[in-house]
From Swiss-Prot:
It comes from Rattus norvegicus (Rat). V-ATPase is a heteromultimeric enzyme made up of two complexes: the ATP-hydrolytic V1 complex and the proton translocation V0 complex. The V1 complex consists of three catalytic AB heterodimers that form a heterohexamer, three peripheral stalks each consisting of EG heterodimers, one central rotor including subunits D and F, and the regulatory subunits C and H. The proton translocation complex V0 consists of the proton transport subunit a, a ring of proteolipid subunits c9c'', rotary subunit d, subunits e and f, and the accessory subunits ATP6AP1/Ac45 and ATP6AP2/PRR. This is V-type proton ATPase subunit E 1. PANTHER family: ATPASE H+-TRANSPORTING V1 SUBUNIT E1A-RELATED (PTHR45715). Expressed in brain (at protein level). The modification Phosphotyrosine is found at residue 56. The modification N-acetylalanine is found at residue 2. Belongs to the V-ATPase E subunit family. The gene is Atp6v1e1.
Length: 226
């Protein structure tokens, strides 16, 4: 039985409605999927940027912390250097004061003579040369001459060697030093400095750990003494 025009139109409308509905559903599905992908991508981008921002500020924070440590280390080093300089200045002042007091030793002739006797004899023992020359301040000549005369027989007995010891009459030690002697071998190429200043410097160097300990206390970081 043939369909009437009305039936045909009705079926066409029904098919059109079905196609339209399916198209709408497909479009909605595409929109939903697109929105889902968009949200996923947006979330990924947001998370990526968030991580980048966090990483940036963490890096900045580490840089600032490192700069703080460096600045603190520099400040501590500067403070430590200031303390060391102040300590060295104090020790230098004490040594200078001690050198100034050496003049008092020289004024006591008896005491100074005993000191010269020891310095001359010690210098002879250090050189152990067959011929030696003793140099002194011009004003100390009589005392040094007496010291040399005492030292020669003591040296000969101790070393069992003959020796020729002369006092330098061509050159004297500067008058502005505290005193003491310098002793040379025969050709003046080897010298033993036994001036009062050189002896004080030697003693100060040998006793520096004790001096520092007495002034500033023991150094907890130091394992050995000089």
């Amino acid at each position: 039985m043939a369909l009437s025009d009305a039936d045909v139109q009705k079926q066409i409308k029904h098919m059109m409605a079905f196609i339209e509905q399916e198209a709408n559903e497909k479009a909605e599905e595409i929109d939903a999927k697109a929105e889902e992908e968009f949200n996923i991508e947006k979330g990924r981008l947001v998370q990526t940027q968030r991580l980048k921002i966090m990483e940036y500020y963490e890096k900045k924070e580490k840089q600032i912390e490192q700069q703080k440590k460096i600045q603190m280390s520099n400040l501590m080093n500067q403070a430590r250097l200031k303390v060391l300089r102040a300590r060295d200045d104090l020790i230098t002042d004490l040594l200078n004061e001690a050198k100034q007091r050496l003049s008092k030793v020289v004024k006591d002739t008896t005491r100074y003579q005993v000191l010269l006797d020891g310095l001359v004899l010690q210098g002879l023992y250090q050189l152990l040369e067959p011929r030696m020359i003793v140099r002194c301040r011009k004003q100390d000549f009589p005392l040094v001459k007496a010291a040399v005369q005492k030292a020669i027989p003591m040296y000969k007995i101790a070393t069992k060697k003959d020796v020729d010891v002369q006092i330098d009459l061509e050159a004297y030690l500067p008058e502005d030093i505290a005193g003491g002697v310098e002793i040379y071998n025969g050709d003046r190429k080897i010298k033993v400095s036994n001036t009062l200043e050189s002896r004080l410097d030697l003693i100060a160097q040998q006793m520096m750990p004790e001096v520092r300990g007495a002034l500033f206390g023991a150094n907890a970081n130091r394992k050995f003494l000089d």
